[in-house]
Every structure is written in structure tokens, then in C-alpha cells.
Amino acid sequence: MTRMVQCTKLGKEAEGLDFPPLPGELGKRIYESISKEAWQQWLKQQTMLINENRLNMADPRARQYLMKQTEKFFFGEGADQASGYVPPAQG
């Protein structure tokens, strides 16, 4: 049976994640209140941030930056945007 959550990011009930995507308290929060759809949106955003900022994921500072961006994306004012990124037109 599919696990449903009230997705904080999307503001609607949607299919939940199968397991916590990150260790620790943030992973637990995401698992409990973020949908698969919103998580996929974050993965795209995260990829843009890594590429645009040329983050080296072996660097603890880069990982810390991404964890802060993850929390802001789901539970705060929104993550940083890649400079020069223009979302595709809807239609």
C-alpha cells in the first residue's frame, strides 16, 4: 500500500517517500512531511546548485551548504537559485 503524506512543500496530500532520504533529524522530517514529487523537484534543484557552484561533494563545506539548502527548500524561504536559470514556460 502506498504511504501518503500531507506534503509541506506542495501543500497537498501526495505519495510519500519509501524511506528517509538523509540521515538524522532532517531526513526524518523530510520522510514524514515531503512527497516523492517534491523530493524529485529538490533533486533537480540540487543538481543545478552543484553544477552552477562547482561544488565538490568531498568538501565538508559543500555538503553543509547543500544540507542548509535542502532545509530551506522544504521548510524555509526556498533554496538559492542557480544564477542565470530561467524556468521553462508553462503551456
From Swiss-Prot:
One of its GO terms (cellular component) is cytosol. InterPro entries: Fe_traffick_prot_YggX, Fe_traffick_prot_YggX_sf. Belongs to the Fe(2+)-trafficking protein family. Keywords: Iron. This is Probable Fe(2+)-trafficking protein. The keyword Iron applies. GO terms for molecular function: iron ion binding. GO terms for biological process: cellular response to oxidative stress. It comes from the Bacteria. Could be a mediator in iron transactions between iron acquisition and iron-requiring processes, such as synthesis and/or repair of Fe-S clusters in biosynthetic enzymes. Pfam families: Iron_traffic (PF04362). Disulfide bonds: none annotated. The lineage of its organism: Bacteria, Pseudomonadati, Pseudomonadota, Betaproteobacteria, Burkholderiales.
